[in-house]
Amino acid sequence: MKNFFRKFFKTVAFLACLLVLFYLVSCIFAFKQDDGIMNMDHFYDLPKDTVDVLLLGSSHIGVNVDPSILWNQRGIAAYNCWGRMQQPWNTYYYLKECLKYQTPKLIVLDVYGMTFSGDYPSYDSLVQGTQGLRFSKDKIENILVSAPEEYRSALLLGLPASHYRYNEITKEDFQNFFWNKDTKIQSVEISGNPVQSFDIMDISGITQSEPLAEKCEIYFRKILDLCKEKDIPMLLLTSPYYLHEQEQRRFNRIGEIAEEYGYPFLNFNENYHELGLDTHKDYCDLSHMNMAGIEKYTSYLADYFVSHYQLPDRRLDDNHIWNRVVE
């Protein structure tokens, strides 16, 4: 009997060591892109009831809207759970995940991703659209709906999808364990002062709508239904950029769906001059603003948020985590 228990405890100890080793190696080799992955990793570090405004979508919101400006100007506690080329189904599952940990007073979705076509994005987008979530039923569903069959097992296991990073490992990869917390306010940084000059087409004459891709509309409606179910106000918008006629027709369709659900939709391609934006000075490429444009756009949104929604000024709350971090 003693031999049995000795073998049993040795086996348990061995398996426990294997699990710990697997965890440590997984953390070191895990993908660590800022968008879609590390922003979610830091989201999990936030105390409950930290986030009043949840920002979702592609780089059109991730690069163009700076949460630190929202905080500094209006005391808006906003968090950006964006991902590059974030697909509508990824947005849906990221929203579901976020609502497990925070109860925002407003959800803001940049709907550029709703104009996408195709069922599967690039592999990089697959990684950034799935690997930021903690392992759960929702993460499994997200991977199954996002990835073609040949990529699913690697994405589900995590480590096989990222093991090739061995030649990219830096000291920062050893600061990604559960005891490493990052609760600071998000901010956008554009290095240098890049400028891309272009003109946004006059879309006033584009009045017809075009159907969204079937899969995109299904998950767009799932997002809207979830917000209705949770009784959380939602604002749909699209930041101004160098768009094409087909995209505007799809934005018209998005406007129709938004009206169906009773949610406002701000298409800033129609009135970007009201934001004070100059497309010959305030952009670093055809879709993303430089720091001058980011400040103008985010400042406009800050004023809009507080004038249309009941959002507290968290700078007055000494117990809020971002007051403690700032201090």
Regions found by a protein language model. Name each.
Residues 124-230, 315-327:
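Secreted/periplasmic serine-hydrolase-like ester/acetyl group-modifying domain
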Residues 252-325:
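C-terminal regions of proteins
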Residues 78-84, 208, 212, 286:
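Acidic/histidine-rich helix-loop elements
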Residues 56, 60-146:
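Membrane-embedded segments
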Residues 106-118, 177-274:
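Conserved, well-ordered alpha-helix/loop/beta-strand core segments that scaffold catalytic motifs
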Residues 29-50:
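Alpha-helical transmembrane signal-anchor/signal-peptide segments
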Residues 6-27:
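Hydrophobic membrane-insertion alpha-helices, especially the h-region
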